[in-house]
Amino acid sequence: MHYAETIAESHLTPAEQAKREGLKARKPYVAQKLANIAAMEERGEISPIIRLEKSYLCNFQCTHCSAEYYMDRHKKKVFKIEDTRSKIDLDFVRKLSKEADDLGLARFVITGGEPLVMKDFDDVVAALDPEKHYIITDTNGWFLDDARAKHLKDIGVEKVQLSLDSMIEKDHDNFRNKPGSYKRVLRAVDASLDAGLNLLLSTVLVKGRVKTQEFIDMCEYATKKGVGLYVSYAKPTGSCSDHPEFVIDKEDADILRDLEKEYNVFTHMTPTYGSYKGCITVKGIITVTSTGEVTPCPYIDMSLGNLRETNLKEVLARGMRNPWLGPYRPDCLIGEDQQFIKFHTKKTKGFTHLPVPWGQGFSDENNTLTDGVEA
């Protein structure tokens, strides 16, 4: 994902600077941690956003869902089994918040699943502690009306990331398998802005879509609303593993890079305010699953360890030691590196309880780029 908060303040626009000043007045500790990130990176330290998947409950069944294979409904349908692994609780979330704070980490994204169906959503926000961390939530927008948006702001959520997959109503609803979802998303956009929440629109790019007028219309809509449009490439994981025709090609990526010059549209690979970090595995993002496993990317289904057994500092160190994940790389590992995709597919195919545990996928033993990959 694209998070402007990671960049030095000297590169901010006036509007972004005003947002920073507002945060500084309301939450000085959080604002200072965000301001420290650039210096951390200059020292060679990492400050990944932490995606927290406490629950995979969802009211949608999206065609492109990267989390579908983690959901109980998928395991029951495909494997005829239930996931009996114990799930993380609020005490786990509080401990994670403290470990992250001790490392100077500043940002959490509550995701899933659909976070706003979680009965304990407010408790999760409180456990993360909005006075210590910048709290973001993903949502499909179905439940995000004026009252809910104001409530999110009141409990300490700073930013909402809304999923919008087409400016053509029937296409969006079909992609989401939810009639009426398009109208709900547009309602949620206005509700979020009216409540004073920071807002990011998120959309999945499938092959050929970037060449359509619909995609240009979405870029223009986001620009008109004054919000960024984050573009996620369809990747060969989750539900998309059944749709290889969704995966974009180089021509699509090149066209998108040209559009970035004209609109406020970006990917996780986009240079931000003069800073280019390349692939953000571990360095820029990690995911904590509902069973406490840590993956280096939302689309990589192999664990770096379980936080019930290993502390966050060591899990991050494992990731940075791994030759796939730690070094700078200009390409998207799971989206473009065919050797890694082959390795990932071999390790994850048919695995019933993702992610693949530490030692069975990633390990300190597979410490070269060819380990575990057949010729």
Tell what function each PLM region has.
Residues H2-T13, A18-N36, E41, I46, ...:
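Flexible mid-to-C-terminal extensions adjoining Fe-S/redox cofactors in radical SAM and related proteins
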Residues M1-E9, I155, K159, S163-D165, ...:
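Radical SAM enzyme [4Fe-4S]-AdoMet core and its adjacent flexible, acidic
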Residues L52, Y56-N59, Y273, T291, ...:
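Processing junctions and N-termini across compartments
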Residues D72, V117, D145, E169, ...:
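Generic structural signal for helix capping and beta-alpha/helix-loop junctions
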Residues C58, C62-C65, C279, C297, ...:
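Short cysteine clusters
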Residues H2-E158:
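Conserved alpha-helical substructure of the radical SAM core
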Residues I50, V282-G284:
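Short loop/turn microsegments at loop-to-beta-strand junctions
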